[in-house]
């Protein structure tokens, strides 16, 4: 189980990303459309002035059952250990053990 403070930090980051998503997208669109280097520099400074945690790349995928940050399967939102346990128990519909 991951530390509760780390899970809380990730939840906080998700909220901040949602709050600044529209502003960040507008600035990025303006940055891409700008041709003048000075104008691009000014827009880049505005993007840098946004909070660091407002960037979507700062969010870490975590297992929803244990909070572990590594080995998380996107399709299920579970870490590899939980995926294996729940698949063996039959709690994941459509998941079967492979055999060939």
UniProtKB/Swiss-Prot annotation:
One Pfam family linked to the record: Ribosomal_S14
Top-rank taxon, per record: Bacteria
One MF annotation (Gene Ontology) recorded for this entry: structural constituent of ribosome
Protein name (record): Small ribosomal subunit protein uS14
Annotated keywords: Ribonucleoprotein, Ribosomal protein, RNA-binding, rRNA-binding
GO biological process, one term: translation
Family per record: Belongs to the universal ribosomal protein uS14 family.
Complexes and interactors: Part of the 30S ribosomal subunit. Contacts proteins S3 and S10.
UniProt keyword rRNA-binding, yes or no: yes
NCBIfam families on file: PRK08881.1
Function: Binds 16S rRNA, required for the assembly of 30S particles and may also be responsible for determining the conformation of the 16S rRNA at the A site.
A cellular component term, taken from the record's GO annotations: small ribosomal subunit
Species per Swiss-Prot/TrEMBL record: Prochlorococcus marinus (strain MIT 9303)
């Amino acid at each position: 189980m991951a530390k509760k403070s780390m899970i809380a930090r990730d939840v906080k980051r998700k909220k901040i990303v949602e709050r600044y998503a529209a502003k960040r997208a507008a600035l990025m669109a303006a940055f891409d459309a700008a041709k003048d280097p000075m104008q691009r520099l000014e827009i880049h400074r505005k993007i840098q002035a946004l909070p660091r945690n407002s960037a979507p790349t700062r969010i870490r995928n975590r297992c929803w059952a244990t909070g572990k940050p590594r080995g998380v399967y996107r399709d299920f939102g579970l870490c590899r250990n939980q995926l294996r346990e729940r698949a063996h128990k039959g709690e994941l519909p459509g998941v079967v053990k492979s055999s060939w």
